[in-house]
Amino acid sequence: MTDVIGESTSIDLDDKYQAEKGSFFFTGVQALVRVPLDQMRADRLAGLNTATFVSGYQGSPLGGFDMEIIRHQELMVGQNLVHRSGLNEELGATAVMGSQVSSVFPQQNYDGVLGIWYGKAPGLDRAGDAIRHAQYAGTSEHGGVLALTGDDPANKSSTLPSASEFAL
């Protein structure tokens, strides 16, 4: 008789963040958490020593993003990933902008820093000035910035119905 099940393999729930090959399943928020980890793996293969700095304002619809990073903090430490919640969206965006100017200092700890800002659409409105200045300042040679914005058109968790298309 032919064995149709195949060999037993063990699966660890942290594979979605740690495995470098193979198939694994995760939610959209978990996929966003994996993005900086994959980027830093690619950087290391290219001979770069990089880090990631994540900041934004907690709350839905992207509230699960920061909670997922915090939930798996022990995995992030070895990956040079630092998460600091902002007091508001604007301060989070300003902190991410600061991660890009590290290259101007003579003694750098990293070749580059990936900055990730997150917030919902009303927060994007609030952070607009900081984000505009960050765009003009640019990023470091081996850094970059990713902005994650969650919309709330049904006004489930915001003070007003919101969408980010126009602000972006």
Predicted segments, located by residue:
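Thiamine diphosphate
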Residues: 1-168
